[in-house]
Each structure stands twice: as structure tokens, then as C-alpha cells.
Regions:
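The feature encodes the CheY-like receiver
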Residues: 28, 70, 97
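Acidic catalytic/metal-coordinating carboxylates
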Residues: 47-50, 73-76
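Non-catalytic signal-transmission and effector/linker regions of two-component phosphorelay proteins
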Residues: 1-19
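Active-site beta3 strand of CheY-like receiver
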Residues: 58-64, 69
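Charged docking surfaces used in two-component/phosphorelay signaling
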Residues: 29-37
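Short hydrophobic/Thr-rich beta-strand motif most characteristic of the beta2 strand and flanking loop
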Residues: 39-46, 54
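Alpha4 helix (beta4-alpha4-beta5 surface) of REC/receiver domains from two-component response regulators
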Residues: 53, 76, 83, 96-103
Length: 103
């Protein structure tokens, strides 16, 4: 499975690069196994600062972002990313309390 490039309607011959930013090792591992099994290239970061740095170093085709990160809140990471990139971001979180939900 490949993502279409934002700059072209043509499919790339290279697998899409997905960056997972999540502090839970087991979740990163599960996502990595699932996505690599589907043909994607996957990179992992265990906190928000590493995720921001990794995105700046080599911009991924898409990001899977946890909101409950230990160093920087995931919403802050999202805000910072949106200041300089429009990369697609999927929010993945285990938040379940009503006051923690994103509108």
C-alpha cells in the first residue's frame, strides 16, 4: 500500500514513510508490525521532542501521534508541527475521560 504524493497524482514506487510518535513501546511495536506488514516504511519516536526533531530531519508522508506524551503534550506537538508542515497526522490516544477528549 502506498500513499499518493502531495505534489503529484502519480503513485510512488517507494513505500510511504510513516512516523509513529508514542511513548508506549507496545503500541509502537504493534503499529510498526501492522504497517510494515502492509508495505509501509515505519520510524518510531518515544516522545514529542524526538518526534519534532525526526520530522524536521526527514519529513514523513504521515504521522501517527499520541496525545499523552511524557515530555510535550501531543496537542502541543500538533500545534508546533502545523506551524511548518501540512503532513497528514492521525491522532491515536487512550484518553477516555470526558474532560480529556478533543472536540
Amino acid at each position: 500500500m502506498f500513499l499518493k504524493s502531495n505534489s503529484s497524482c502519480l503513485m510512488s514506487n517507494f513505500p510511504a514513510d510513516i512516523l509513529i510518535i508514542d511513548d508506549e513501546r507496545q503500541i509502537r511495536r504493534l503499529l510498526n508490525l501492522t504497517l510494515t506488514g502492509a508495505g509501509y516504511h515505519v520510524r518510531e519516536c518515544e516522545n514529542g521532542q524526538l518526534g519534532l526533531s525526526e520530522t524536521a530531519l526527514k519529513r514523513p508522508d504521515a504521522i501517527i501521534l499520541d496525545l499523552g506524551l511524557p515530555d510535550i503534550n501531543g496537542l502541543e506537538v500538533l500545534k508546533q508541527l502545523r506551524e511548518w508542515t501540512q503532513v497528514p497526522i492521525l491522532i491515536l490516544t487512550a484518553w477516555d475521560r470526558e474532560d480529556e477528549k478533543v472536540d
